[in-house]
Amino acid sequence: MSAEVPEAASAEEQKEMEDKVTSPEKAEEAKLKARYPHLGQKPGGSDFLRKRLQKGQKYFDSGDYNMAKAKMKNKQLPTATPDKTEVTGDHIPTPQDLPQRKPSLVASKLAG
């Protein structure tokens, strides 16, 4: 039993020494808590912020929103039907094939 008493005494002494070492830190911490009482109360922000974050994915700007919207549309679009008979590029137009250009109602400033 006598062997346990010095161990207990040494443990108490160590605790006192630790308290002395950490007491300046605790004193500084107490000063900061007195000066800024609202800090450290609610980690993670206000209730409003937490509620908004729980609602789901939010977008950085309208570009992100539109890109996500386009991705969703692309997944829902049906594939093009292959039964189209219209072929493009088989005929090269000539000036005679093109329709006549309509004259402009506003006179050009360049035509003198």
UniProtKB/Swiss-Prot annotation:
Region of interest (Disordered), ranges: 1-49, 72-112
Role of this protein: Protein phosphatase inhibitor that specifically inhibits protein phosphatase 2A (PP2A) during mitosis. Inhibition of PP2A is enhanced when ARPP19 is phosphorylated. When phosphorylated at Ser-62 during mitosis, specifically interacts with PPP2R2D (PR55-delta) and inhibits its activity, leading to inactivation of PP2A, an essential condition to keep cyclin-B1-CDK1 activity high during M phase. May indirectly enhance GAP-43 expression.
Amino acid composition bias (Low complexity), ranges on this chain: 1-11
BP terms from Gene Ontology: cell division; G2/M transition of mitotic cell cycle; mitotic cell cycle
Gene: ARPP19
PTM statement from Swiss-Prot or TrEMBL: Phosphorylation at Ser-62 by MASTL/GWL during mitosis is essential for interaction with PPP2R2D (PR55-delta) and subsequent inactivation of PP2A. Phosphorylated by PKA.
Organism in which the protein naturally occurs: Bos taurus
GO cellular component: cytoplasm
Descriptive protein name: cAMP-regulated phosphoprotein 19
Bilayer-crossing regions: none
Places the protein is found: Cytoplasm
Xref: InterPro entries: Endosulphine (IPR006760)
Keywords: Acetylation, Cell cycle, Cell division, Cytoplasm, Mitosis, Phosphoprotein, Protein phosphatase inhibitor
Residues with Phosphoserine modification: S2, S23, S62, S104
Modified-residue entries (N-acetylserine), positions: S2
Family assignment from sequence similarity: Belongs to the endosulfine family.
Reported tissue expression: Isoform ARPP-19 is found in all brain regions and also present in non-neuronal tissues. Isoform ARPP-16 is enriched in the caudate nucleus, found in low levels in cerebral cortex.
Residues the record lists as N6-acetyllysine modifications: K109
Gene Ontology terms for molecular function: phosphatase inhibitor activity; protein phosphatase 2A binding; protein phosphatase inhibitor activity; protein phosphatase regulator activity
Basic and acidic residues: compositionally biased ranges: 12-32
